[in-house]
Amino acid sequence: MICAVYKSSRKQETYLFVPKRDDFSQVPEPLLQMFGTPLLVMLLPLDRKEKLGIADIDKVRSELAQKGYYLQLPPPKDNLLTQHRRDLGIED
């Protein structure tokens, strides 16, 4: 299975995987509006991959088959001040 991976023109580190290049027919319109203009990053052969960067490859395959797309959001940002306070033993 080969899928197309697009990055968002509006949201940093946000990617949309679709089964066919330039086929967004299964992606809900509100999601496409939030996503902005999809910018093609790569065509990705999922059947030859065992691991992806931060996405669970089994979940990507499953959602592509069931929903027709997979949306990868950026990981949550660490709050450095909270982490520093925790390291110092200071509770909020």
Curated annotation (Swiss-Prot):
Among the Pfam families in the record, one is: YcgL
Q: Which organism is it from?
A: Shewanella amazonensis (strain ATCC BAA-1098 / SB2B)
Q: Where is the YcgL domain?
A: 1-85
This protein's name: YcgL domain-containing protein Sama_1929
Q: Which domain of life is it from?
A: Bacteria
What the entry lists under InterPro entries is as follows: YcgL-like_sf (IPR038068), YcgL_dom (IPR027354)
The protein's matches in PANTHER family, at most eight in alphabetical order, are given as: PROTEIN YCGL
